[in-house]
């Protein structure tokens, strides 16, 4: 499975094409729209979310509510494009229209792709960079992830995400009875946090940052239950599933670090407190006493829950902008201000769920058969029985 996205933040639409989705997967627009709505929620979001009410159009690859094995094309329109038709339109501008158009962006924002991208592609107007590098693109990544989640759900695999930390405020209560309980609690939290008291403090931290013209980041965690043992590979570096998961999470806008399981904490513990003892019982087969490895060893799943964390830096667009340099005059100025969020960590947890779900679904489809959902399901059932008796 693979996908590609296209579209700019204030262009007419965002598009993604998904290839390799097996035939026979039940899929309707509401499945995807539910995930898009989750992405748009979250304390600290900016005014753009009041304009956009994201709804997907499935334009190929699905017939009568079932995937047919062909590429799936998904489109999400940008309602805000109505205000940007001249600035972001594809048609050439007249000389008069160029004069009337807003000035070019020549002051790169520290922390963004603006300057590096402008140098790479030779853009004197950095809007060409910031429009594509915007996190608005994650809209269709979440759409792709929604399809991957459907694949996983059909195979009995559950995905959930939550926020562990925002702006230095860390959740103390992170335990849960079932993944359904985790989902229920976090869906009711404006910051997608399991710890209610910490959630209130996180919201206050966001308010304080917004009032001062600043932004704050945080840490999100994705948990996946039900993965079979042995998905991934130890044979080649580029087939290791933990490497693919790390790359996927790091590809999310503003993410600067990834942990799997206890992650960096492993550096502070002796091996006896890091590695997970192996157990066996007749009902479950092989299992582990603990899950410090986060469900992955040697590039493969262990059968325990997959646990991935990502660190998101504060959004670089600030209402009290940092110093930068105008590329035309080379003079020092305050960086450009674009409409932005004060904190997008809660929304980023939904994006993290999407990219993790995509990588896991891809690994399952590759390993257990790529064409039909019923065949994949049967192959996994046989594999699980084999693993129990091994």
UniProtKB/Swiss-Prot annotation:
Presence of keyword Transmembrane helix: no
BP terms from Gene Ontology: amino acid biosynthetic process; aromatic amino acid family biosynthetic process; chorismate biosynthetic process
The protein's assembly and partners: Homotetramer.
Record's protein name: Chorismate synthase
GO cellular component: cytosol
Cited function: This reaction introduces a second double bond into the aromatic ring system.
Essential cofactor(s): FMNH2
Xref: InterPro entries: Chorismate_synth, Chorismate_synth_AroC_sf, Chorismate_synthase_CS
Sites where the protein binds FMN: 132-134, 253-254, 298, 313-317, 339
Cofactor note: Reduced FMN (FMNH(2)).
